[in-house]
Amino acid sequence: MVDILRLVWYHQLEVRAMLINSVVQREAVRNEQMILQYESLIGELPKGSITCRKNGYYYLRYREDGKLYDRYIGKGAEKVDAIREKLALRKHYVEMLSALKREQKTIHRLLEELA
């Protein structure tokens, strides 16, 4: 009788381990998909910062291939505000992406331990 109970107990542990493993694998796939989505969203948004020069002329300052570029935005507050919103959105996406990458490392460590 004790052997049967022990066998059932071990079987329950195996089932739990398999369930945990499948949940973690699904989370890894979801995490990878979200990383790809955030990377594509970040690629569409402008990078850099807004600078104001003499007489209220605004420029978008960014680096590309190690070189510093200034792209003229204009004097209009609407254009400047729109680009500021896009820059803030990009910053948010970059923060989310770094959190997802940290989470991905944890998931891979967990999968290695479960294997």
Protein language model features and the residues they cover:
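A positively charged, amphipathic N-terminal helix/segment that binds anionic biomolecules
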Residues: 1-115
